[in-house]
């Protein structure tokens, strides 16, 4: 199982949000320092999120460029990618893969065009949900779509990588909801990356046992609950 450190960008800084709430952020300083530390500890892929772009409050293009220039490992970029132009820009900034969420839920036609433009290896889809209740627009808006129906539709469209985040648990260090993760794993036939609430090595063991392909880890790394070098070795 691949361990993927997450670096969320807000106003050029690395932060973590509690349950996706922009008003409840914990700052963690220079994103380049965080990215380099994770790389040195053995990460083989980094997950970058432009929170300002996702929330419509700005963008962190320069911070992304700085992180990209500092890394020798690949990174994937998420946050506010809601047009073909934004997709191409994300890849031009150096991302090996772009991650889309709101578009995949609200505009399947655009998702199909994105897949056609760059292929399934360079485009992943994010299912952000409170349990299985889907949320969009930077996690600020509930969607009426059924999570399991979306998974079936995306698989049929040719999506090959899914990032599932349980927003209820993101940034909380509360651990995983085993039942929900198991349901997502059972419904998704391709590569599955899971985040939201991972707090301990035991959570990583649970994901491995459920057959999950990758773990998105944020606050647990910043707070020292999980030591990446040791976890990478054990995985």
UniProtKB/Swiss-Prot annotation:
Pathway(s) of this molecule: Amino-acid biosynthesis; L-histidine biosynthesis; L-histidine from 5-phospho-alpha-D-ribose 1-diphosphate: step 4/9
Record-listed E.C. numbers: 5.3.1.16
Pfam families: His_biosynth
InterPro entries xref list: Aldolase_TIM, His_biosynth, HisA_bact_arch, Isoase_HisA-like, Isoase_HisA-like_bact, RibuloseP-bd_barrel
Transmembrane is among the record's keywords: no
GO CC annotation terms, alphabetical: cytoplasm
Family label: Belongs to the HisA/HisF family.
Record protein name field: 1-(5-phosphoribosyl)-5-[(5-phosphoribosylamino)methylideneamino] imidazole-4-carboxamide isomerase
Organism taxonomic ancestry: Bacteria, Thermotogati, Deinococcota, Deinococci, Thermales
């Amino acid at each position: 199982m691949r361990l993927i450190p997450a670096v969320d960008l807000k106003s050029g800084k690395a932060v973590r949000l509690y349950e996706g709430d922009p008003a409840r952020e914990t700052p963690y300083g220079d994103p380049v320092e965080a990215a380099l530390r994770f790389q040195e500890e053995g990460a083989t892929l980094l997950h970058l999120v432009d929170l300002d772009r996702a929330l419509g409050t700005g963008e962190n293009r320069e911070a992304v460029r700085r992180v990209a220039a500092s890394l020798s490992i690949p990174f994937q970029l998420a946050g506010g990618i809601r047009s073909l132009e934004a997709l191409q820009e994300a890849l031009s900034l150096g991302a090996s893969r772009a991650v889309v969420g709101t578009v995949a839920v609200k505009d399947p036609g655009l998702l199909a065009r994105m897949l056609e433009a760059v292929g399934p290896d360079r485009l992943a889809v994010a299912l952000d949900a409170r349990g299985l209740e889907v949320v969009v627009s930077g996690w600020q808006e509930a969607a009426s779509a059924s999570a399991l129906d979306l998974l079936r539709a995306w698989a049929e469209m040719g999506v090959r990588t899914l990032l599932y985040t349980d927003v209820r648990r993101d940034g909380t260090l509360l651990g995983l909801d085993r039942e929900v993760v198991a349901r997502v794993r059972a419904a998704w036939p391709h590569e599955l990356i899971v985040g939201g609430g991972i707090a301990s090595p035991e959570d990583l063991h649970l994901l491995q046992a459920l057959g999950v392909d990758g773990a998105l880890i944020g606050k647990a790394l910043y707070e020292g609950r999980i030591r990446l070098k040791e976890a990478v070795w054990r995985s």
